[in-house]
Design a protein with these regions (language model features):
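Alpha-helical phosphate/pyrophosphate-handling elements in metalloenzyme active cores
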Residues: 18-48, 60, 69, 73-81
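An amphipathic alpha-helix signature
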Residues: 4, 8, 31, 71-75, ...
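His-Asp-centered metal-binding catalytic motifs of divalent-metal-dependent phosphohydrolases/nucleases
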Residues: 45-62, 70, 91-101
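Basic/polar N-terminal segments that are highly enriched at the extreme N-terminus
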Residues: 1-2, 214
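Divalent metal-dependent phosphate-bond-processing catalytic cores, especially two-metal-ion Mg2+/Mn2+ enzymes
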Residues: 15-24, 28-41, 54, 103-214
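Hydrophobic, well-structured mid-protein blocks that either form specific transmembrane helices
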Residues: 81-118
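Generic N-terminal amphipathic, Lys/Arg-enriched alpha-helix
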Residues: 6-17
């Protein structure tokens, strides 16, 4: 089998018991998004595919905040597949730099391939799927839906963002609604804008229902 086929099997096996917002189906959606975006970008498609498939192989949220496990697993797997060091290091850099970590985070590595995979991942945090994933994770962490007296914190450090226990609805303001202005590619920006509008409409409906209207 090809390295791509083996990577798919590896990811499916490792994520078979993952939280629903970060499972194989999330990875598959990101993979499809990445292929769509890559059609309009100058990139190494093999690195885009591998980066998309391996980007959440060990999300730090589910490993006590340890950000080294995912890159380590990816490197070990790609080495077992006899991938070149150039490909391995690039994919590892994508995994290390893809995540949103609060408003003050700057990427330490840049490439067209990272831009594509990052946009693909961010798109899955937007729109209807993004809303579903957000409330699924909030339920997983046993967080309240909304507490009117707890305002969103838009200026969190990386550590504050990672350790936040805020109500689920705050996440829209602390991350999701910020993403459309953080997209890297023209294709990503266009899709993000439509999904952003969907979320704004959802929030308007949510608040109306919270107050007993509509």
């Amino acid at each position: 089998m090809s390295i791509l086929d083996n990577t798919i099997l590896f990811v499916k096996e490792n994520l078979q018991n993952a939280e629903a917002g970060h499972d194989w189906f999330h990875v598959e959606r990101v993979y499809k998004n990445a292929l769509l975006i890559a059609n309009a970008e100058d990139c190494n498609l093999e690195i885009v595919k591998l980066g998309a498939l391996l980007h959440d192989i060990a999300d730090s949220k589910f490993h006590n905040g340890d950000e080294t496990i995912g890159p380590k697993l990816a490197r070990e797997f790609l080495e077992s597949q006899k991938a070149s060091e150039e490909v391995i290091s690039h994919v590892v850099n994508i995994i290390e730099n893809i995540s949103f970590k609060g408003g003050n985070f700057e990427k330490k590595f840049t490439s067209n391939e990272l831009d594509i995979v990052q946009d693909a991942d961010r798109l899955d945090a937007l729109g209807a799927i993004g809303i579903a994933r957000t409330f699924n994770y909030g339920g997983f962490k046993n967080r309240p839906l909304y507490l009117p007296n707890i305002a969103p914190n838009l200026h969190m450090t990386k550590e504050e963002y990672k350790n936040s226990e805020a109500p689920t609805l705050n996440h829209f303001y602390e991350k999701l609604l910020l993403l459309k202005d953080k997209m890297n590619t023209e294709t990503g920006k266009k899709i993000a804008l439509e999904r952003h509008k969907f979320m704004e409409n959802f929030l308007s409906q949510f608040y109306a229902e919270w107050e007993g209207g509509k």
